[in-house]
């Protein structure tokens, strides 16, 4: 249930505006039952509030492992190319979805952080600058919010 609700930032990505926009669309489409479950784990804040959370915490020692999770690679045929050494957005999304299938048997803190991961990473995957195109020049420009955001240069 939690994974389904989410599947419906900065110079290198959406920033707050883009993440909050995507989260607001998800929030507007939540089923009441999903909203109730999410509120149990996120408290008084909506999913929009936590949309950029992962960008704000990835530089802390506790969440440093998530630094490379914000992008995904595709090959010359635009087929997803996993990055198992450090992880990536797709593998992190899949792991969070698998964990949350058993959310009722997980510690509340584990459920909350995985909801936040999904909120953020699904938003990242809707930003062209968060996709690394193997074998291609990464110098394309993506205009957002009146300025250009830079694509991922390497992974």
Language-model features and meaning:
Residues 12-121, 128-155:
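N-terminal, motif-rich segments that launch catalysis or mediate targeting to/interaction with membranes
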Residues 8-10:
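N-terminal signal peptide c-region/cleavage motif recognized by signal peptidases
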Residues 1-3:
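Sec-dependent signal peptide recognition
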């Amino acid at each position: 249930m939690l994974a389904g609700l989410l599947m419906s930032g900065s110079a290198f990505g959406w920033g707050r505006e883009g993440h909050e926009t995507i989260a607001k669309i998800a929030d507007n489409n939540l089923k009441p039952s999903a909203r109730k479950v999410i509120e149990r784990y996120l408290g008084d804040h909506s999913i929009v509030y936590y949309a950029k959370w992962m960008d704000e915490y990835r530089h802390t020692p506790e969440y440093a492992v998530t630094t490379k999770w914000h992008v995904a690679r595709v090959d010359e045929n635009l087929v997803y190319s996993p990055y198992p050494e450090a992880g990536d957005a797709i593998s992190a999304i899949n792991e969070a979805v698998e964990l949350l299938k058993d959310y009722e048997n997980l510690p509340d803190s584990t459920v909350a952080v995985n909801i936040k991961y999904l909120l953020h990473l699904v938003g990242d995957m809707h930003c062209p600058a968060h996709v690394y195109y193997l074998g291609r020049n990464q110098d394309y420009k993506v205009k957002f919010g009146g300025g250009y955001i830079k694509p991922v240069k390497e992974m």
